Amino acid sequence: MRTRSQVWAQKAYEKVREAAKGEGRGEYRDMALKLPVLVRQAGLSQALAFVDSRGKEAHKALGNDLAQVLGYRDLRELAEAAREAELLQYLRLTREVLAAAEWFKRFAQALIEE
């Protein structure tokens, strides 16, 4: 039996490995490095809205990848869940997003060159 963090790590690794092969990998890496800090500073809903509004496919790809790792269809569904969540659910979702985002950050540092 694996922990939730282990499952997220495996899925994040696969997503980042795929992103490392594609166009926009530098932008994907940059956003992966910034996302945990952005969530801590601006809050979950604002951070997700920022990623969605950037207009760059690599940023949206990261948002969608993060959402899928956490069991959501895409970034917009994750953002909707954050907007509609009660306080305790919102705090839990924030912790989950931060935990998964840290895996994306680490794997982006390791797999995507600057």
UniProtKB/Swiss-Prot annotation:
<dbReference type="Pfam" id="PF09701">
    <property type="entry name" value="Cas_Cmr5"/>
</dbReference>
<keyword id="KW-0051">Antiviral defense</keyword>
<dbReference type="InterPro" id="IPR023101">
    <property type="entry name" value="AF1862-like_dom_sf"/>
</dbReference>
<keyword id="KW-0963">Cytoplasm</keyword>
<dbReference type="GO" id="GO:0051607">
    <property type="term" value="P:defense response to virus"/>
</dbReference>
<keyword id="KW-0614">Plasmid</keyword>
<comment type="subunit">
    <text>Homotrimer.</text>
</comment>
<comment type="function">
    <text>CRISPR (clustered regularly interspaced short palindromic repeat), is an adaptive immune system that provides protection against mobile genetic elements (viruses, transposable elements and conjugative plasmids). CRISPR clusters contain sequences complementary to antecedent mobile elements and target invading nucleic acids. CRISPR clusters are transcribed and processed into CRISPR RNA (crRNA). Part of the Cmr ribonucleoprotein complex.</text>
</comment>
<comment type="similarity">
    <text>Belongs to the CRISPR system Cmr5 family.</text>
</comment>
<dbReference type="GO" id="GO:0005737">
    <property type="term" value="C:cytoplasm"/>
</dbReference>
<dbReference type="InterPro" id="IPR010160">
    <property type="entry name" value="CRISPR-assoc_prot_Cmr5"/>
</dbReference>
<protein>
    <recommendedName>
        <fullName>CRISPR system Cmr subunit Cmr5</fullName>
    </recommendedName>
</protein>
